[in-house]
From Swiss-Prot:
It comes from the Archaea. The keyword Phosphoprotein does not apply. Keywords: Amino-acid biosynthesis, Cytoplasm, Histidine biosynthesis, Isomerase. It comes from Methanococcus maripaludis (strain C5 / ATCC BAA-1333). It is found in: Cytoplasm. It catalyses: 1-(5-phospho-beta-D-ribosyl)-5-[(5-phospho-beta-D-ribosylamino)methylideneamino]imidazole-4-carboxamide = 5-[(5-phospho-1-deoxy-D-ribulos-1-ylimino)methylamino]-1-(5-phospho-beta-D-ribosyl)imidazole-4-carboxamide. InterPro entries: Aldolase_TIM (IPR013785), His_biosynth (IPR006062), HisA_bact_arch (IPR006063), Isoase_HisA-like (IPR044524), Isoase_HisA-like_bact (IPR023016), RibuloseP-bd_barrel (IPR011060). SUPFAM superfamilies: Ribulose-phoshate binding barrel. The keyword Heme does not apply. This is 1-(5-phosphoribosyl)-5-[(5-phosphoribosylamino)methylideneamino] imidazole-4-carboxamide isomerase.
Length: 238
């Protein structure tokens, strides 16, 4: 199982938000490319980049850093935040992204995933599903849909999604542990790899995810606040 450090960018800084709220930050650091290099030096085999300006405002202002991280980190990079069109996704793949993470638009128009998979190949498409109170939420967690994660997950798998990034919003950024059940349901009901995110605070949390068969876990606040040592975490889940 992969332990995948998050490098979330807002206003050209590396940040960690509390429950996705742009006004509530745990962490704010300069020079995201340097942070990315630090995680790779500690053993990260993949990086998770999020353009929060893109996600929240639909404007991509961190492209320069994203390109630098892809070029200099030496590991595969999955990228999300503000990818609202096929053109956006193709642009990032051409720049060298291993996977592009598609959120809101995939839930609103699942057929776009079919079109995208024909353009860039399904292995490059990761769909981000965020759930709150058992339902998928979109538009930066502001709007609740009628779908459960498994319902929309099955549709997206059929359309050609290559993997799912699943965030349990109820746990995200609160640093008080995880609820494993929603992720477990996805792993049991879908064939494509699931990467989990949200609420990891201990190596024990990571081991619980490993036990249910996820492909990887994105870690954010816990490594930035030194609650988890990344090297130890990677070693523990090998």
């Amino acid at each position: 199982m992969l332990v995948i450090p998050a490098v979330d960018m807002k206003n050209k800084k590396c940040v960690q938000l509390i429950q996705g709220n742009p006004d509530k930050k745990h962490v704010e650091l300069d020079n995201p490319p340097e942070i990315a290099k630090k995680w790779v030096s500690e053993g990260a085999e993949m990086l998770h980049l999020v353009d929060l300006d893109g996600a929240l405002d639909g404007k991509r202002v961190n492209d320069e850093f994203i390109e630098e991280i892809i070029k200099t980190s030496g590991v595969p990079v999955q990228i999300g935040g503000g990818i609202r069109s096929i053109e956006d996704a193709v642009y990032l793949v051409e720049k060298g992204a291993k996977k592009v993470i598609i959120g809101t638009i995939a839930v609103e128009k699942p057929e776009i995933i079919k079109e995208l998979s024909e353009n860039i190949g399904s292995e490059k498409i990761m769909v981000s599903l965020d759930a709150k109170d058992g339902k998928v939420v979109i538009k930066g967690w502001k709007e609740k849909t009628k779908y459960t994660p498994v319902e929309i997950g099955k549709i997206l798998e059929e359309m050609g999604a290559g993997s799912i990034l699943f965030t349990n919003v109820d746990s995200e950024g609160l640093l008080n542990g995880i609820n494993i059940e929603p992720t477990k349901e996805l792993v049991e009901n879908l064939k494509i790899p699931i990467v989990a995110s949200g609420g990891v605070t201990t190596i024990d949390d990571l081991l619980k995810f490993k036990e249910i068969g996820v492909y990887g876990v994105v870690v954010g606040s816990a490594i930035y606040k030194n609650m988890i040592n990344l090297k130890d975490a990677i070693e523990a889940v090998k």
